[in-house]
Each structure stands twice: as C-alpha cells, then as structure tokens.
C-alpha cells in the first residue's frame, strides 16, 4: 500500500471512531457532539494529503486486499477506487459536513437526543463516502441503500409531526422506485458479465444493451429527484435544517448524478441514453425553477433550487461532460449548504417563521447571515468570480457549442434565468425593506458555532471554484474559439433574470390582481403533480376497492349466496308443491259468484 491509499484509509477509520465509541461507555464521560465535529475536522485535514498526492501524480489507485465471498463464479472483494472523482469529492464532503456539524451544535442544542442525531449525520456521511469510493456494484449498493435509510431516519427526526413522517415515507418510497432500476442493472451485469467490478464491466461491455443503462438512469432519477420522481425533495424540508443542508449539498441528492458519472464509460457512445438524460434534465431544471418562483417558504425555495441544479447536472451528463457535472457537484455543495444554514439561522431567530412574506429588514438586524445569504444566492445564479460561476459558465458554454437537441438547450437557458429570479426574490423579501415580523425574543447571531460554520462556507462560496479549477486536471485547457455572444450567454441570461426579478417584485408592490392567474396556480401548486399523483390516483383506487369490497362482495356473498338464495329456493319449491296459487281476490269473486247464482236459483 502506498501513501495515498494509507492516508485515505486513515481518513475513513477516523470517521468510524465516534461510531465505535458510541457502542462503548466512553462517550458518557465526554461530550459526544464536539467529539464528532473534531473527528470530521481531523478527517478533512487528513483527506487533503491523498488528494494533493493524487493531484501531483494523477495516478489512480485501487485497494482490493480483502476478499469477501465467492458465490459460484462471482468473486466479491471489499475494494476502494481512489480516482479523480473520489479523491476530489472526499475533502469537499468532509469540509461541508464539518461546518454543518458545528452549525448543528447551535441549532439542535435543546434536542434531548442530540447525540443520536450526530451519530445519524455521521453515518449519513460515511455511507456516502462508501458509495463514492466503491470499486464494485455491490459495495456501491451498500452505500446507496445506506444514504437512503439514513435520509429516512433524519427527515423523520421529529417523529411527533405527521408531515415529517409523511415526508420520510415519501422519500423512501420514491427511492424504492429508483432502486428497482439499480437492482435491474446489477442483475444484468451479473448475468452477462459475471462480475460487479467496474474495470471488468467497462472492458467487457463497452457497448452494452439499453436495459442496464435505463436501469441506472431510473436509479439516478429516483435518488437525484429528476422529473417524475421529484416530489420527495421539497417534502424533505420537514426535517431539521442541518439535515436539509447535508442532504442537498454533498450526500444523497448528488448520489444519482455520481452514479451516472461513475458509469459514463458505458454511456459516452450511446446517443439514445444521452438524449434521454439531456431531455430529462432540461424538463427537471425548468419545471422545478417554475415551481420555485411562487413559493413562500424559504426552505422550499432553496430545495427547488437544488432540484433545478440537479437537472442542470443531468443536462451536463446528457451533453457528454461528466467531469463538468462533477465540478458543479463540488462547487454546488459549498453555497447550497450555506444557503440552508443561513435559512436555518433566520428561522431559528424568528421563532420558526419560514414565510418570506413575514420577514424583511433582516439586513440590519442580522448583517452576517444576510451577507452570507446574499453571497450564496449570487453564487447560485452564476455571478462572475464566485464559486458557481466557474462551473455554470462552462456548462452554458458547452451547451451552446454542442450539436444536440436545441429545444432542451433553450429550456436550460430559460431555467438558468429563472434561477436569478427566485434568488433575488429571497433577497428582496427576506433581507430588504421594512421588518414585517414581531419577535418575542431579541435576534442574536453572535454564537461562535453559528458564525464560524457559515464563515467557512462563505469563504468556500467565494474561493472554492477558483482553487478547484486551477488545481485539478485539466489545468491547461486548450484554447477555444467561439463568438463573443456565446461566451457572454451565461452572464446575459443571469442579468436578464435579475432585471425580470426586480420588475416582478416592484410590480407586486404596485398592482393587486383580483384572481391568481392559471400560471401562478400551476407554479404554486407544483404543477398539480402532488394532487394528481398523491390524491387523485389513490382516491380513485380507494373508491374502486371500496366499491369492489362493498358492492360486489355484498351482492354475491351477502345476497346471492345466502339469504336471497334461500328465499328464492323456498319460493320456487313452495310454488311447485302448493295447489293454491294465492289469488285471494279471484277466490272471493268465485265464492261471491257461486253465492249469487245459488240465490238466483232459489228465487
């Protein structure tokens, strides 16, 4: 084992120590939350060593020392793949999680089960790192299911709330649909390749069938909340804010895109699957951007922005740029985690108020949080020389210079301008103007746990893009020639979004619409998707099953088989046996006629 693999394993071992400590009685003598935070900070510093070694050497390493089991001809080993993607993602994930852990110590300080909460967050991070460093499908599946079950436990952390339980179930059920695709791909590779090791699969199946690729795309659609399987992502906001920050920045939601990046050697020559990814990503990024425009819950707006950015990453995969999609994952983690933490700070200080219409004037009362929120929002829009710019600008350039579906590319540009609209809307309503809230407690953002954690991510949102693009391969990009208007497209689209946002905000102050428009209803109701999928179809199924149970069962069993059948049998048998017909009127009439006839004869 070389230095790179040794330090990587040390990083993973440092992260597992708090879990082992929790099993023993040692943690009862020491505060557990600071210990977990310090462990992640140490793991981050340790992970920088193998990352810098990899950047300097550029040599991929595979650790495969532990044989696990042999099933007939399938040999399974615990193996770690230390390549470009895993080596660069580990420090980013650890840095972001370190800040989120420190923020959680402030945000969850009054929770009676805070130690368990920190253990869950740490296990969430470990399962994501297992997924990222896995060198075979089975190990990747363990990490994949691990982030799924940990998200279920963390989203439903406040289990006394019905909405939190429903959101947790929704997340796990939508991800089960995606897991069907993952298991389908695993079964196909086992049947046709007899291996789950990445290197062997890529050599044997350079041009595979569509079945495993469709399965992998379905898995990524479920985990990364693409259109069709997207409703769980905004619902996940029912969990605590640190969970939202970790879930949306560097763990679960990017796992689907990471899966496609890992399998890009099988997809790079398949135009059908690339077109599917491009169109799916374009629809997702536009639809979720439209939904974000009219939301009033600050966490829901940030959640829809995550879904929109995931759609943009899927578009990047669709134009065959996996390294660019990975760069956007790394850049996106910094400012998205910070946006959620700033939102959590505002919500905590305003006594759990999440409606941006009831905020305002926070720039004066919470200057540090407001400044950080503004930096994060501008980085999200792709403002030049902030972190988001370095990946988003390259994505828009690649989109403009690619020869693929023009409609999908146009939709992507429209969605990019909408990113600026909802980002400015948060700034306009929450930070500017006059206060529209009444607080029973004074607003305070002087806690060092809050300040230090947001400060680190604010620096990352400003500088991380520059450092990443200047230190990772390729460091020297070949000189490209393109017209000036294509180079400036990303900036022009963002400026257009800013102008539209200010115009809309000013218009809503001056005009009052009598009735909401259909477009507003579509956006505010999330495209009527939840009420169609979660209410209409289940209610129809319920009514149909109710009718089947009550009408059909009653008709056959309660009526036809027993009571009515017996009465019908008795009536038929009595009619056949009896001499009398039961015609009482006829009998009386015949008696009367005979009586009258007798009287006439006597007279």
Curated annotation (Swiss-Prot):
PANTHER family: NADH-UBIQUINONE OXIDOREDUCTASE CHAIN 5
Name by which UniProt lists this protein: NADH-ubiquinone oxidoreductase chain 5
Originating species: Lemur catta (Ring-tailed lemur)
Job of this protein: Core subunit of the mitochondrial membrane respiratory chain NADH dehydrogenase (Complex I) which catalyzes electron transfer from NADH through the respiratory chain, using ubiquinone as an electron acceptor. Essential for the catalytic activity and assembly of complex I.
Keyword Translocase applies: yes
Topological relation to the membrane, as annotated: Multi-pass membrane protein
Gene name of this polypeptide: MT-ND5
Cellular localisation: Mitochondrion inner membrane
GO cellular component, one term: mitochondrial inner membrane
Primary localization: mitochondrion
BP GO annotations: electron transport coupled proton transport; mitochondrial electron transport, NADH to ubiquinone; mitochondrial respiratory chain complex I assembly
């Amino acid at each position: 084992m070389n230095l790179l693999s040794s330090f990587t394993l040390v990083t993973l071992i440092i992260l597992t120590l708090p879990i082992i400590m929790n099993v023993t009685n040692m943690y009862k003598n020491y505060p557990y939350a600071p210990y977990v935070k310090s462990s992640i900070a140490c793991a981050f510093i340790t992970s920088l060593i193998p990352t810098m070694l990899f950047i300097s050497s550029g040599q991929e390493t595979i650790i495969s020392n532990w044989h696990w089991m042999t099933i007939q001809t399938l040999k399974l080993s615990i193996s770690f793949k230390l390549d470009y993607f895993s080596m660069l993602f580990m420090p980013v994930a650890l840095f972001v999680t370190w800040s989120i852990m420190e923020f959680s110590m402030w945000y969850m300080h009054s929770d009676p089960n805070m130690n368990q909460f920190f253990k869950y967050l740490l296990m969430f991070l470990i399962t994501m790192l297992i997924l990222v460093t896995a060198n075979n499908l089975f190990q990747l599946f363990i990490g994949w299911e691990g982030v799924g079950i940990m998200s279920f436990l963390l989203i439903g952390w406040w289990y006394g709330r019905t909405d939190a339980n429903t959101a947790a179930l929704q997340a796990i059920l939508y991800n089960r649909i995606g897991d069907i695709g993952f298991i389908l791909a695993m079964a196909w590779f086992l049947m046709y390749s007899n291996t789950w090791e990445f290197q062997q699969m890529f050599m044997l199946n350079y041009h595979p069938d569509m079945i495993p690729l469709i399965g992998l795309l379905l898995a990524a659609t479920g985990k990364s909340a693409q259109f069709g399987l997207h409703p769980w992502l905004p619902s996940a906001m029912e969990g605590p804010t640190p969970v939202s920050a970790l879930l949306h920045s560097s763990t679960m939601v990017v796992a689907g895109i990471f899966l496609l990046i890992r399998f890009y050697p099988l997809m790079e020559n398949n135009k059908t699957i690339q077109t599917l990814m491009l169109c799916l990503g374009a629809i997702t990024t536009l639809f979720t951007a439209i939904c974000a425009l009219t939301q009033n819950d600050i966490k829901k707006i940030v959640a829809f922005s995550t879904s929109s950015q995931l759609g943009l990453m899927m578009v990047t995969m669709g134009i065959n740029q996996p390294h660019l999609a990975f760069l956007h994952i790394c850049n996106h983690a910094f400012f998205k985690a910070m946006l959620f933490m700033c939102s959590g700070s505002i919500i905590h200080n305003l006594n759990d108020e999440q409606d941006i219409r009831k905020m305002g004037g926070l720039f004066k009362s919470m200057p540090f949080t407001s400044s950080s929120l503004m930096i994060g929002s501008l980085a999200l829009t792709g403002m030049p020389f902030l972190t988001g710019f370095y990946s988003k600008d390259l994505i828009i350039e690649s989109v403009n210079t690619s020869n693929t579906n023009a409609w999908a590319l146009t939709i992507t540009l429209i969605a990019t301008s909408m990113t600026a609209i909802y980002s400015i809307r948060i700034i306009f309503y929450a930070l500017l103007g006059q206060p529209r809230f009444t607080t029973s407690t004074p607003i305070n953002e002087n806690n060092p746990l809050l300040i230090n954690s947001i400060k680190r991510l604010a620096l990352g949102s400003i500088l991380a893009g520059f450092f990443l693009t200047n230190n990772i391969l390729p460091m020297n990009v070949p000189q490209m020639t393109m017209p000036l208007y294509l180079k400036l497209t990303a900036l022009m689209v963002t400026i257009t979004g800013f102008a539209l946002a200010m115009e809309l905000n000013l218009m809503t102050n001056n005009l009052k619409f009598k009735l909401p428009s259909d477009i507003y209803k579509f956006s505010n109701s999330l495209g009527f998707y939840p009420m169609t999928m979660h209410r209409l179809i289940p209610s129809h199924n319920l009514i149909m099953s109710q009718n089947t149970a009550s009408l059909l069962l009653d008709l056959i069993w309660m009526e036809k088989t027993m009571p009515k059948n017996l009465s019908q049998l008795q009536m038929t048998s009595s009619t056949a046996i009896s001499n009398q017909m039961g015609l009482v009127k006829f009998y009386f009439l015949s008696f009367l006629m005979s009586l009258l006839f007798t009287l006439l004869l006597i007279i």
